Amino acid sequence: MNKRKQKQISRILAAKRAEKCGQINAELQETGEYLEGRVHLLRAKLSINGINLKAYVLEQVINIKHQIVTERFGNVLLGLASGMIGGIIGMFMWVLCIL
């Protein structure tokens, strides 16, 4: 091969390498832009989920407060009912003891 052909081949190979590097750089840039977009979307989604999570936690706290009030009310009613039943039984026992 003569020197002219070798130079042409080396130029073609260099151009192909440069083109390949350019394609790789373009792909890297596109990938970077895509990832930045995804990160932005994920941050937005997390902030929305954070707001939803706060609302959910607040709702659960309110539900727990209602359950506690209901349980206390139920315990008070149960105590009153058992006291009344105990009083009635005590009265009958007292009456039976007198007879």
From Swiss-Prot:
Query: Where is this protein primarily located?
Result: host cell
Query: What's in the keyword line of the UniProt record?
Result: Host membrane, Membrane, Transmembrane, Transmembrane helix
Look up keyword Transmembrane and say if it applies.
yes
The annotated topology with respect to the bilayer is:
Single-pass membrane protein
The regions listed as transmembrane in this protein's record are: 76-96
- Got a GO cellular component term for this one? membrane
Could you tell me where this protein is found in the cell? Host membrane
Q: What is this protein called?
A: Uncharacterized 11.1 kDa protein in rep-hol intergenic region
